[in-house]
């Protein structure tokens, strides 16, 4: 089991993010992890980033709504 744990653990840890811990020789930043999370929720992050930069949630959402309404009718076909 010692040979089993030493080799399989290294590969299994990479596959499982929950049980994966950075080793002393590896350098992992939290930014890369956040970037990976931003990909599926790009719509939510873009709205949050705008609200943080502007400081007004109502303004950013209103601007987004205006942009959506100004888009061509191909966007409204989804509704």
Curated annotation (Swiss-Prot):
Residues 1-79 are annotated as: Disordered. It comes from the Viruses. GO terms for biological process: symbiont-mediated suppression of host innate immune response. Keywords: Host-virus interaction, Inhibition of host innate immune response by virus, Suppressor of RNA silencing, Viral immunoevasion. Residues 1-13, 38-79 have a biased composition (Polar residues). Pathogenicity determinant. May act as a suppressor of RNA-mediated gene silencing, also known as post-transcriptional gene silencing (PTGS), a mechanism of plant viral defense that limits the accumulation of viral RNAs. Belongs to the geminiviridae protein AC4/C4 family. This is Protein AC4. It comes from Bean golden yellow mosaic virus (isolate Puerto Rico).
